[in-house]
């Protein structure tokens, strides 16, 4: 097994899909279990402009996995 410890992070970026996402989205990042409650809260409030970004993160950086848009 690798000696590196990776954690799955989920970043919530609020905004609209489309041009300029990388520049306009400001991610709010936390450990995935904590983020889950934030996501649920936003869903209950009817927020329909959320993008979920997934990363594997270790001490030296992060590796982007992918995004899921809720529309």
Curated annotation (Swiss-Prot):
Superkingdom assignment: Eukaryota
Protein name according to UniProt: Uncharacterized protein YGR121W-A
């Amino acid at each position: 097994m690798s000696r590196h410890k990776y954690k799955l992070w989920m970043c919530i970026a609020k905004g609209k899909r489309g041009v300029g996402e990388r520049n306009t989205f400001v991610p709010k990042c936390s450990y995935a279990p904590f983020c889950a409650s934030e996501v649920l809260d936003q869903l209950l409030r009817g927020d329909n402009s959320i993008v979920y970004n997934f990363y594997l993160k270790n001490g030296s950086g992060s590796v982007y996995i992918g995004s899921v848009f809720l529309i």
